[in-house]
A protein has these predicted regions:
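A domain-start/cap signature at the N-terminus of enzymes
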Residues: 27-89
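Catalytic active-site module of serine/aspartate enzymes centered on a nucleophile-bearing elbow/loop
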Residues: 306-359
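Conserved alpha/beta-hydrolase
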Residues: 111-128
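Short beta-strand element of the alpha/beta-hydrolase
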Residues: 89-98
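The feature captures the conserved acid-bearing segment of alpha/beta-hydrolase catalytic domains
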Residues: 221-319
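Alpha/beta-hydrolase active-site loop
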Residues: 136-192
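Bacterial N-terminal signal peptides that target proteins for export
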Residues: 1-9, 20
Length: 360
């Protein structure tokens, strides 16, 4: 089956899967708000190997998707965190990038549960290297890596090794090992899957692109794309979306290479984020930023594009107070992950200056 035909299958799967998921959730019993039953409230930080949780997990060395490194170190460690001292919002963030403890601390302080799962994300330097790359190549690989279903001819990721199943198995494990933290809230009534309507997909760079691609296929609570999405030669951004357009949020630095090539403006507009407000500079406008979905920063990174790329994530390259060292984008991160999705800015036209057809 060619990648073009698989792309058509993916569109059909979005439409059918979305209806099935909505029907299943409509038939489930209404849930009471999540509350913690923890006699000793605290900030929990847990780790577990995917291969220990699920014996079906396998390595895929052909795409550098490993269980152990070449030196024998565990490569499939997954992280989870929740703070039972904070009133829970009943939302689970699935983070698609390397573990970022500073980010997880902030997510937990907002009342969010957070996990990072081990999934196939190193294929990018191995697959779809032809020039020009097929318009569905990377998008289909992202979807297969996320779902464990056969969307691509270039990789073979079975269900146990897809992000969806690994996230589900991890949450099941957390519900057993850390029951006082309410992880079972995110399992379906029959315990056979995750309640994706309560999941926030998020990532940075490569991970933010996969998060957005997955949300086109599976309806989720929201998407937070930090320094992304990219895939400027791919067409998935304009596909029908199972996740409503108002649930996509983005934040990037203007000196990031994704702006030089119109990658970000293209993805943001094709996804439909312009329908909920203009691009807003968070260094010039205070929260809630006109309730827009498209945020940028232009703080001084000394012309360093590499720093600019990762400056929108908590860490050494983020904007900080020169005296205290405190992060200066705290309000931005809180907004991205907690702004009510039904509160949005006014639509603006797409930009003629942004090149949306980069395959010409």
């Amino acid at each position: 089956v060619t990648n073009d035909i698989r792309a058509l299958f993916a569109v059909t799967a979005v439409l059918v899967g979305s209806v099935v998921a909505q029907d299943a959730q409509a038939q489930s019993k209404p849930r009471a708000p999540l509350t913690f039953r923890d006699s000793s409230v605290r900030h929990y930080k847990l780790t577990a190997r995917a291969s220990r949780i699920d014996p079906r997990v396998k390595a895929h060395p052909e795409i550098d998707f490993l269980i152990e490194s070449k030196t024998g170190q565990p490569a499939d460690v997954q992280q989870a965190a929740v703070d039972t001292r904070v009133a829970p919002r009943g939302k689970l963030v699935i983070w698609l990038m390397g573990h970022n403890e500073a980010l997880f601390d902030r997510l937990n302080s907002y009342g969010l549960h957070a996990i990072r799962v081990h999934y196939a994300n190193r294929w990018f330097s191995i697959c779809c290297r032809e020039n020009p790359v097929g318009e569905h190549c990377r998008g289909n690989i992202r979807l297969e890596a996320a779902t464990g279903h056969d969307f691509s001819d270039d990789i073979q990721i079975p269900k146990p090794d897809g992000m969806m199943e690994r996230a589900y198995q991890f949450v099941k494990w957390l519900a057993r090992e850390n029951p006082q933290a309410g992880w079972n809230y995110f399992l379906t009534g029959d315990g056979q899957g995750l309640r994706w309507d309560d999941v926030i997909m998020s990532g940075s760079s490569h991970g933010s692109t996969t998060a957005a691609r997955f949300a086109k296929f599976q309806k989720v609570s929201r998407v937070v794309a930090l320094c992304g999405p990219r895939d400027h030669l791919q067409s998935w951004q304009s596909l029908p979306s199972a996740t409503p357009e108002n649930r996509y949020f983005g934040f990037s630095h203007v000196l990031d290479g994704g702006w030089v090539g119109d990658h970000y403006c293209r993805s943001w507009e094709l996804i439909g984020m312009h329908k909920f407000g203009p691009i807003v500079n968070v260094d010039k406008v205070q929260a809630p930023y006109g309730n827009t979905r498209r945020l940028i920063t232009d703080f001084d990174v000394k012309g360093d594009a590499r720093r600019a790329h990762s400056s929108v994530v908590p860490g050494s390259r983020a904007k900080k107070d020169a005296t205290t060292g405190a992060y200066l984008h705290e309000d931005v991160w809180r907004y991205l992950y907690t702004q009510p999705v039904d509160v949005a800015g006014k639509a603006v036209p797409t930009s003629d200056a942004c090149n949306k057809n980069q395959r010409q």
